[in-house]
Design a protein with these regions (language model features):
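Hard-cation-handling environments
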Residues: 215-241
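Metallocofactor- and cofactor-centric catalytic cores in central/energy metabolism, strongly enriched
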Residues: 1-88, 96-125, 130-134, 139-224
Length: 261
Protein backbone atom coordinates (compact mmCIF):
# COMPACT_ATOMS: atom_id res chain seq x y z
CA UNK A 1 0.00 0.00 0.00
CA UNK A 2 2.79 2.43 0.89
CA UNK A 3 4.65 1.61 -2.32
CA UNK A 4 1.51 2.38 -4.31
CA UNK A 5 1.03 5.74 -2.61
CA UNK A 6 4.65 6.67 -3.24
CA UNK A 7 4.27 5.92 -6.95
CA UNK A 8 1.31 8.30 -7.12
CA UNK A 9 2.60 11.21 -5.01
CA UNK A 10 5.71 12.30 -3.17
CA UNK A 11 3.62 14.01 -0.49
CA UNK A 12 2.26 10.91 1.26
CA UNK A 13 2.88 10.75 5.01
CA UNK A 14 2.42 7.31 6.53
CA UNK A 15 2.98 5.88 10.03
CA UNK A 16 6.13 3.88 10.73
CA UNK A 17 4.09 0.96 12.02
CA UNK A 18 0.54 -0.33 12.13
CA UNK A 19 -1.59 1.76 14.48
CA UNK A 20 -3.05 -0.86 16.79
CA UNK A 21 -4.32 1.40 19.57
CA UNK A 22 -6.06 4.76 19.86
CA UNK A 23 -2.95 6.12 21.56
CA UNK A 24 -0.79 5.08 18.62
CA UNK A 25 -3.28 6.78 16.32
CA UNK A 26 -3.41 10.05 18.26
CA UNK A 27 0.37 10.19 18.46
CA UNK A 28 0.55 9.92 14.68
CA UNK A 29 -2.26 12.41 14.08
CA UNK A 30 -0.38 14.97 16.17
CA UNK A 31 2.35 15.03 13.51
CA UNK A 32 0.27 15.71 10.38
CA UNK A 33 -1.81 18.46 8.75
CA UNK A 34 -3.43 16.59 5.86
CA UNK A 35 -5.35 17.86 2.84
CA UNK A 36 -6.57 14.28 2.22
CA UNK A 37 -6.83 11.30 4.57
CA UNK A 38 -6.63 7.76 3.21
CA UNK A 39 -8.07 5.62 5.98
CA UNK A 40 -7.17 1.95 5.57
CA UNK A 41 -8.34 -0.83 7.85
CA UNK A 42 -5.68 -3.51 7.61
CA UNK A 43 -7.70 -5.68 9.97
CA UNK A 44 -10.90 -5.47 11.95
CA UNK A 45 -11.21 -2.17 13.83
CA UNK A 46 -14.13 -0.51 15.52
CA UNK A 47 -15.41 2.98 14.75
CA UNK A 48 -13.31 4.64 17.46
CA UNK A 49 -10.35 4.93 15.11
CA UNK A 50 -12.28 6.63 12.31
CA UNK A 51 -14.08 8.86 14.82
CA UNK A 52 -10.77 10.05 16.26
CA UNK A 53 -9.60 11.04 12.79
CA UNK A 54 -12.85 12.74 11.85
CA UNK A 55 -13.14 14.87 14.97
CA UNK A 56 -9.67 16.28 14.32
CA UNK A 57 -9.74 16.98 10.59
CA UNK A 58 -12.26 18.34 8.10
CA UNK A 59 -10.36 17.43 4.93
CA UNK A 60 -11.70 14.84 2.42
CA UNK A 61 -11.47 11.16 3.36
CA UNK A 62 -10.91 8.08 1.21
CA UNK A 63 -11.81 4.84 2.98
CA UNK A 64 -9.70 2.01 1.58
CA UNK A 65 -10.62 -1.61 2.26
CA UNK A 66 -8.12 -4.30 1.28
CA UNK A 67 -9.20 -7.22 -0.84
CA UNK A 68 -7.72 -10.11 1.10
CA UNK A 69 -6.19 -13.17 -0.59
CA UNK A 70 -8.03 -16.46 -0.26
CA UNK A 71 -5.90 -18.96 1.67
CA UNK A 72 -7.09 -22.50 2.38
CA UNK A 73 -6.39 -23.33 5.98
CA UNK A 74 -9.60 -22.82 7.87
CA UNK A 75 -8.48 -19.65 9.61
CA UNK A 76 -10.39 -16.38 9.75
CA UNK A 77 -9.27 -13.64 7.44
CA UNK A 78 -8.10 -10.32 8.85
CA UNK A 79 -11.53 -8.81 8.18
CA UNK A 80 -10.50 -5.55 6.59
CA UNK A 81 -13.97 -5.33 5.07
CA UNK A 82 -15.65 -5.84 8.44
CA UNK A 83 -13.65 -2.94 9.85
CA UNK A 84 -14.73 -0.81 6.90
CA UNK A 85 -18.37 -1.15 7.94
CA UNK A 86 -17.56 0.39 11.31
CA UNK A 87 -15.50 3.17 9.73
CA UNK A 88 -18.15 3.75 7.08
CA UNK A 89 -20.84 4.23 9.70
CA UNK A 90 -18.68 6.79 11.48
CA UNK A 91 -18.03 8.61 8.22
CA UNK A 92 -21.73 8.63 7.40
CA UNK A 93 -22.49 10.14 10.80
CA UNK A 94 -19.75 12.77 10.73
CA UNK A 95 -19.90 13.68 7.02
CA UNK A 96 -23.47 12.83 6.04
CA UNK A 97 -22.11 10.11 3.79
CA UNK A 98 -19.73 12.48 2.00
CA UNK A 99 -16.61 10.38 1.52
CA UNK A 100 -14.88 8.25 -1.11
CA UNK A 101 -14.48 4.48 -0.94
CA UNK A 102 -12.40 1.82 -2.67
CA UNK A 103 -12.33 -1.95 -2.14
CA UNK A 104 -9.25 -3.51 -3.68
CA UNK A 105 -5.67 -4.68 -3.36
CA UNK A 106 -2.75 -2.30 -4.06
CA UNK A 107 -1.90 -4.27 -7.21
CA UNK A 108 -5.30 -3.67 -8.82
CA UNK A 109 -5.45 -0.99 -11.53
CA UNK A 110 -8.88 0.15 -10.32
CA UNK A 111 -7.44 0.81 -6.87
CA UNK A 112 -4.62 2.90 -8.30
CA UNK A 113 -6.99 4.93 -10.51
CA UNK A 114 -9.37 5.71 -7.64
CA UNK A 115 -6.60 6.74 -5.24
CA UNK A 116 -4.92 8.84 -7.95
CA UNK A 117 -8.18 10.64 -8.71
CA UNK A 118 -8.81 11.38 -5.03
CA UNK A 119 -5.28 12.72 -4.55
CA UNK A 120 -5.59 15.01 -7.58
CA UNK A 121 -8.99 16.28 -6.43
CA UNK A 122 -7.70 16.94 -2.91
CA UNK A 123 -4.68 18.77 -4.30
CA UNK A 124 -6.94 20.99 -6.41
CA UNK A 125 -9.26 21.70 -3.49
CA UNK A 126 -6.29 22.66 -1.34
CA UNK A 127 -4.94 24.94 -4.09
CA UNK A 128 -8.30 26.70 -4.34
CA UNK A 129 -7.81 27.98 -0.79
CA UNK A 130 -5.19 30.33 -2.21
CA UNK A 131 -7.36 31.46 -5.11
CA UNK A 132 -8.57 35.06 -5.26
CA UNK A 133 -11.57 35.64 -7.53
CA UNK A 134 -12.67 39.08 -8.67
CA UNK A 135 -16.18 40.09 -9.65
CA UNK A 136 -16.13 43.29 -11.71
CA UNK A 137 -19.55 44.86 -11.41
CA UNK A 138 -22.86 43.09 -10.85
CA UNK A 139 -24.72 40.63 -13.06
CA UNK A 140 -27.19 42.40 -15.38
CA UNK A 141 -30.89 41.60 -15.28
CA UNK A 142 -31.58 38.04 -16.33
CA UNK A 143 -28.10 36.80 -15.43
CA UNK A 144 -28.59 36.28 -11.71
CA UNK A 145 -27.87 32.57 -12.11
CA UNK A 146 -24.19 33.47 -12.42
CA UNK A 147 -24.01 35.65 -9.32
CA UNK A 148 -21.69 34.37 -6.58
CA UNK A 149 -21.76 35.01 -2.84
CA UNK A 150 -18.45 35.46 -1.07
CA UNK A 151 -19.54 33.28 1.86
CA UNK A 152 -20.54 30.44 -0.49
CA UNK A 153 -17.23 30.58 -2.36
CA UNK A 154 -15.35 30.50 0.93
CA UNK A 155 -17.40 27.63 2.31
CA UNK A 156 -17.40 25.36 -0.74
CA UNK A 157 -14.02 26.10 -2.32
CA UNK A 158 -12.10 28.05 0.30
CA UNK A 159 -11.54 30.76 -2.33
CA UNK A 160 -11.70 34.49 -1.62
CA UNK A 161 -14.14 36.56 -3.67
CA UNK A 162 -13.64 40.30 -3.93
CA UNK A 163 -15.67 42.86 -5.82
CA UNK A 164 -14.85 46.04 -7.70
CA UNK A 165 -17.13 48.44 -9.56
CA UNK A 166 -16.97 48.66 -13.35
CA UNK A 167 -16.45 52.42 -13.26
CA UNK A 168 -13.18 52.00 -11.33
CA UNK A 169 -11.59 50.03 -14.15
CA UNK A 170 -13.13 52.28 -16.79
CA UNK A 171 -11.62 55.30 -15.04
CA UNK A 172 -8.25 53.55 -14.94
CA UNK A 173 -8.47 52.81 -18.65
CA UNK A 174 -9.40 56.39 -19.54
CA UNK A 175 -6.29 57.65 -17.76
CA UNK A 176 -3.79 55.81 -19.98
CA UNK A 177 -2.07 57.27 -23.04
CA UNK A 178 -1.78 55.48 -26.37
CA UNK A 179 1.94 54.90 -25.81
CA UNK A 180 1.32 53.28 -22.42
CA UNK A 181 -1.06 50.80 -24.03
CA UNK A 182 0.83 50.02 -27.25
CA UNK A 183 2.12 46.70 -25.87
CA UNK A 184 -1.41 45.36 -25.46
CA UNK A 185 -2.53 46.62 -28.86
CA UNK A 186 0.41 44.83 -30.48
CA UNK A 187 -0.51 41.56 -28.74
CA UNK A 188 -4.13 41.81 -29.82
CA UNK A 189 -3.15 42.62 -33.41
CA UNK A 190 -1.01 39.48 -33.62
CA UNK A 191 -3.70 37.10 -32.39
CA UNK A 192 -6.93 38.58 -33.82
CA UNK A 193 -7.99 38.08 -37.43
CA UNK A 194 -9.52 41.19 -38.99
CA UNK A 195 -8.63 43.59 -36.19
CA UNK A 196 -7.44 46.06 -38.81
CA UNK A 197 -11.06 46.42 -39.93
CA UNK A 198 -12.11 47.56 -36.44
CA UNK A 199 -12.46 51.34 -35.94
CA UNK A 200 -9.23 52.88 -34.68
CA UNK A 201 -10.77 54.32 -31.51
CA UNK A 202 -12.19 50.90 -30.52
CA UNK A 203 -8.81 49.24 -30.96
CA UNK A 204 -7.12 51.85 -28.79
CA UNK A 205 -9.86 51.65 -26.17
CA UNK A 206 -9.46 47.89 -26.10
CA UNK A 207 -5.76 48.31 -25.36
CA UNK A 208 -6.59 50.71 -22.52
CA UNK A 209 -9.06 48.25 -21.02
CA UNK A 210 -6.61 45.40 -21.37
CA UNK A 211 -3.93 47.31 -19.50
CA UNK A 212 -6.37 48.30 -16.74
CA UNK A 213 -7.58 44.72 -16.22
CA UNK A 214 -4.09 43.21 -16.39
CA UNK A 215 -2.69 45.65 -13.84
CA UNK A 216 -5.64 45.09 -11.51
CA UNK A 217 -5.17 41.32 -11.78
CA UNK A 218 -1.43 41.51 -11.12
CA UNK A 219 -1.62 43.99 -8.25
CA UNK A 220 -4.33 42.01 -6.44
CA UNK A 221 -3.08 38.49 -7.19
CA UNK A 222 -6.31 37.55 -9.00
CA UNK A 223 -6.48 34.01 -10.39
CA UNK A 224 -9.99 34.15 -11.88
CA UNK A 225 -12.24 37.03 -12.87
CA UNK A 226 -15.76 37.70 -14.07
CA UNK A 227 -16.78 41.04 -15.51
CA UNK A 228 -19.98 42.85 -16.28
CA UNK A 229 -20.03 43.94 -19.91
CA UNK A 230 -23.44 45.04 -21.17
CA UNK A 231 -24.55 47.77 -21.01
CA UNK A 232 -21.88 49.72 -19.09
CA UNK A 233 -18.96 49.29 -21.47
CA UNK A 234 -21.14 50.24 -24.42
CA UNK A 235 -22.68 53.33 -22.85
CA UNK A 236 -19.91 54.60 -20.56
CA UNK A 237 -16.84 53.58 -22.54
CA UNK A 238 -17.92 52.81 -26.08
CA UNK A 239 -16.00 49.53 -26.35
CA UNK A 240 -17.03 46.11 -24.98
CA UNK A 241 -14.74 44.18 -22.67
CA UNK A 242 -15.15 40.78 -24.38
CA UNK A 243 -11.79 40.88 -26.16
CA UNK A 244 -10.03 41.77 -22.93
CA UNK A 245 -11.49 38.73 -21.18
CA UNK A 246 -10.34 36.53 -24.05
CA UNK A 247 -6.81 37.93 -23.66
CA UNK A 248 -6.88 37.27 -19.91
CA UNK A 249 -7.76 33.64 -20.59
CA UNK A 250 -4.79 33.42 -22.95
CA UNK A 251 -2.62 34.85 -20.16
CA UNK A 252 -3.72 32.09 -17.78
CA UNK A 253 -6.36 34.03 -15.84
CA UNK A 254 -9.78 32.36 -16.07
CA UNK A 255 -12.22 35.09 -17.17
CA UNK A 256 -15.92 35.21 -18.05
CA UNK A 257 -18.41 37.83 -19.19
CA UNK A 258 -21.64 39.19 -17.65
CA UNK A 259 -20.16 38.89 -14.13
CA UNK A 260 -20.75 35.13 -14.36
CA UNK A 261 -18.66 34.03 -11.39
Amino acid sequence: SIDLLNTITDAAIVPDKMLLSIQDLTNFLDTIEPSLIILQNITFANAAYASEVLKRFSCPVLLWTLREPVIDGGRLRLNSLTGAYSAGNALAAFRDGNFEYIFGAPQEERTKKTISACIRAAWLKNELKNLRIASVGHTPQGFGFGRAMDADMQKVFGATLESIEVRELIDMAKGYTDDECSEYLDKMTKCTVGLDKTPDNNRKDFARLCKAYKEYVDENNIGALSSRCWPDFFTAFGTPVCGVLAMLNDMGVAASCEADT
